[in-house]
Amino acid sequence: MANPKVFFDILIGKMKAGRVVMELFADVTPRTANNFRALCTGENGIGKAGKALHYKGSAFHRIIPGFMCQGGDFTRGNGTGGESIYGSKFEDENFKLKHTGPGILSMANSGPNTNGSQFFICTEKTSWLDGKHVVFGKVVDGYNVVKAMEDVGSDMGNPSERVVIEDCGELKNPSS
């Protein structure tokens, strides 16, 4: 079976920046990939925090040029929240896949076995994160949108413009 593909339609400020399409490596990290996929579709409804388990409307709160774009905190919006479809946090599935370069999709965490909903998209090779963060996908289309997001980032991570996931979901025909 083909790996699932999901999308983000990104707003930068008030401008529609375009669509980012990501392949999720369900063949290597099925639990992590399924969490991200379900948070893209919103199919699991409301979480324990009382918020929709859905990336739609959430922001990329931390963008550091030459490093990564981080998002997925749909409960607090500032990097201190988030929730997985399995409850609050879940374990590191494995570290088989590496942070090999731009477009790699990986889980943000606050230490071992603290995966929730926060994730980041690498804009460079970040091998120092190997063995600490679970890689579970990659950008397969729309990397130009990620570069546009990176352009509004800062060394401290605070974007100069709000970067929002205006819409998201799963592409039903992953082979296309």
From Swiss-Prot:
Record organism: Arabidopsis thaliana
Induction text: By wounding, and slightly by light.
Keywords per UniProt: Chaperone, Cytoplasm, Isomerase, Rotamase
Any one biological process term the GO annotation gives: signal transduction
Highest taxon of source: Eukaryota
Listed name of the protein: Peptidyl-prolyl cis-trans isomerase CYP19-3
Lineage: Eukaryota, Viridiplantae, Streptophyta, Embryophyta, Tracheophyta
Molecular-function annotations in GO: cyclosporin A binding; peptidyl-prolyl cis-trans isomerase activity
Domain (PPIase cyclophilin-type): residue spans on this chain: 7-170
Underlying gene: CYP19-3
